[in-house]
């Protein structure tokens, strides 16, 4: 089985993508997986560090607040579409998976036009622009939250939850020990409520 996984820009897209790749490799040992991302973005470092090959496209996001910065946008998009078509032809995937971020647009569009099975994985309760644009063309849309029919065609939605890293799933067997260690590390006690706050758009 040959799989292309595309998307990125932030850790919120990249790490679920790597988790998907790892899950595929666990189930299909001989699966060939190719990542496609955006040149100069985080995925160009994180994906090879995880042991996977990645090809970068010159694609860039549309600047909605700084319109004057969009002069090169159509040229980069056209170049990315041409390169995406070449990648699809050369790699010949059985399925193409998009995880969000503008890098996934060209490769998913190309796969749809060539009748290759496609799906997108939406990690958020409010989908990104690229996934909303791609929704009508892809075969399936994997979501982590209910009521996503507000944004996507109901007949394409599959509730899967969010992919998690293998090292996180392995924590379950040592949860009691880890909990004790965490309480000690952060000087916390169980007689008071504990609130964890995370935020940011770069994988926090």
Predicted regions: what they are:
Residues 1, 47, 173-197:
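Nucleotide-sugar donor-binding and catalytic loop/hinge architecture
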Residues 3-10, 26, 30-76, 81:
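Conserved nucleotide-sugar phosphate-binding/catalytic loop shared by glycosyltransferases and other
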Residues 8, 38-40, 59, 123, ...:
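Cofactor-binding loop segments of dinucleotide-utilizing enzymes, especially the Rossmann-like FAD-
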Residues 13-25:
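Short amphipathic alpha-helix
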Residues 28, 86-92, 188-190:
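Glycine-rich phosphate-binding loop signature in dinucleotide/nucleotide-binding domains
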Residues 53, 112-180, 188:
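Active-site-proximal region of nucleotide-activated glycan assembly enzymes
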Residues 83-96, 104-119, 132-140:
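Glycosyltransferases and closely related glycan-assembly transferases
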